[in-house]
Amino acid sequence: EDNTVLEAVLALPVKYRVPIHLYYYENYKTPEIAKILGKGESTVRSLLSRGREKLKVILKEEYDFE
């Protein structure tokens, strides 16, 4: 199951993949990710939110759950 989630993360477009990876796999907080990426905190929150939505779509296709 962990591999499936990782594969789904890797399938994301890079603009969503990087913040998702930093947040969930490297345990960075939103302000830290904003500094790393040179973006505003609100932008990072939006990227994380949109990335999560895209992950749901990918995983729903994989597992066919709602």
Locate each region found by the language model.
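Residues within helix-turn-helix
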Residues: 31-32, 42
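DNA-recognition helix of helix-turn-helix
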Residues: 37-61
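Short amphipathic alpha-helical boundary/capping segments
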Residues: 4-13
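A short pre-motif secondary-structure segment
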Residues: 19-23
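Intrinsically disordered, low-complexity basic tails/linkers immediately adjacent to helix-turn-helix/homeobox/MYB/SANT
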Residues: 65-66
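Short, leucine-enriched amphipathic alpha-helices that occur as contiguous helical runs
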Residues: 2, 16-17, 52
